Amino acid sequence: MITDRVSDYLEKIEKSDINAFIDLNGERVLKEAKDLEKNEKLKNKSLYGKIIAVKSNINVEGYKISCASKTLDNYTGTYDATVIKKLRSEGALIIGMTNMDEFASGSSGETSYYGPTKNPKALDRIPGGSSSGSAAAVSADLCDMALGSDTGGSIRNPASHCGVVGFKPTYGVVSRQGLCDLAMSFDQIGPLTKTAEDSLNLTNVIKGLDLSNTTSLKTPKFEKKEIKDYKIGVVREFMDVTDEKIRNEIEKGIEVFRDLGCEIVDLSYKYIDLALPTYYLINYVEFYSATRKYDGRRFGEVIEEACGEEVLRRILIGKHISEQEFSGKYYKKALQARKEMKKEMIGLFNSVDLIVGPTVPKLPHKIGEELSPMEMYAYDVLTVLTNICGICSGVVGCGNINGIPVGLQIQGASLDDEKVLSAMIEFENNY
C-alpha cells in the first residue's frame, strides 16, 4: 500500500538526524496517498506511488518555499511549478521540501538558515551542495527519488559526495517555470535518484516544452541506447586538477567503458583556467538581478538584511560589476569568454560521443571546517563547464575512498541527454 510506504518514510525522516528536510506535512501527504490509491486513472502511470522530495527553491503549493533563507522563512508556495504538475500527473507524491545552500549559493550544504545537512555516507562530512538535502534524502533512503537544481554543479556535486545518481539535463530540456532563479542562464532542474534507470524515467516525466517558459524545448522521449561503439573522451586537464586518490578511482571507471567496447580518446581543453572566473562573474551579475525582488515588500524580508555571508558576498560583488563603469571590464569579458569556451567544447564533441572524468576534484571537507571562498569555489571547477556551455551531464557512483563515495561525471553535447543517460545506465550495470 502506498500509504504504508509514506508512513514508513515519514517515520524514518522523523528519526533521522541528517537535517535533509525543511518542511514536511505528514497529514497532507498521507491524505494524498489515500486518494491516489483510489485513483484508477493514475495506476498505470510511470511514477505511480513514487514518493519524491523536492528542493526548497522549486514551488509546490502549500509548502514553505524558503530557498533555505531567513529572507523567505514565512513564504508559502501559491502554485505548483511545471515540473511538480508533471510529477503529479504521473502519479507521484511530494513528501516534503529539502534543505539546501541558501538561495542555492554554495557547494557544501552548510549555508542554510536551518543548519547544515549531514552526508549519510560520512556523517562528519559535507554532503555537497547546493541540492544537499535532496541528495542526502535519497542517499539515506528517506524518499524514492528527489528533484534538485543545478547552476554550476548543484545536482552533480552532492550526488558524487552522497553516492547517488544525479543528472543535469541540457539547458532548456526541463522547464524552469516555478524555480527560484540563482543565475537564469545556467539554472536547470534535474533528478537525484538511487539508480541511473530512475534518472532516465524521471527526466522523461519532467522534461518538455512549456509555453510559460520561453527557454524550454520540445524533445522526443529518451530511450536507453547501445553505447558499444562510442568514442569516450578523457580530458587531460580535468584529471590533472583532481586529487590522486579520486583520479585512481576514475581511471578504474574509464576501464569499464573500454571493456564495454568503447574507444577511449585523450583530449585537451585549453580553457580550464577560465572556468571558475567566467562562471562566477556571470553568476554574480545574474544573481544580483534575480534578488532585486526580495525587497521586503513583495517577498519576505529585505534580502541584504536577512541573508547569510555567502549570499551577501555574491549580491555585493554582483552589484559592483553590474554598474555601467565596470560591466565592460568584467561582465562583457566573461560573456566573451563563455562564447569561446562553448566553441572549444563543441569542437571536442565533434571527435567523441561523450566525455568522462571526475565530478569533484577533492573529497568533501568536514562540516564546520573553515575554507576560504576561493577554496570553496574550487569544488566547482569540473562541473561549471556543463552549465557555461549549456550541455548535459550526469554522475554515477565510481567507488569510494575510505567509505566516502566518488562520482564519475559523464558529459554530452547539447541535446545528447539520451547518450549520457544510456552511458550512465550501462556503466552502473557493469561497474
UniProtKB/Swiss-Prot annotation:
It catalyses: L-glutamyl-tRNA(Gln) + L-glutamine + ATP + H2O = L-glutaminyl-tRNA(Gln) + L-glutamate + ADP + phosphate + H(+). Gene3D superfamilies: Amidase signature (AS) domain. The active site is at K55, S130, S154. GO terms for molecular function: ATP binding; glutaminyl-tRNA synthase (glutamine-hydrolyzing) activity. One of its GO terms (biological process) is translation. It comes from the Archaea. Keywords: ATP-binding, Ligase, Nucleotide-binding, Protein biosynthesis. It is an enzyme of class 6 (ligase). Allows the formation of correctly charged Gln-tRNA(Gln) through the transamidation of misacylated Glu-tRNA(Gln) in organisms which lack glutaminyl-tRNA synthetase. The reaction takes place in the presence of glutamine and ATP through an activated gamma-phospho-Glu-tRNA(Gln). This is Glutamyl-tRNA(Gln) amidotransferase subunit A. It comes from Methanococcus vannielii (strain ATCC 35089 / DSM 1224 / JCM 13029 / OCM 148 / SB). The lineage of its organism: Archaea, Methanobacteriati, Methanobacteriota, Methanomada group, Methanococci. The gene is gatA.
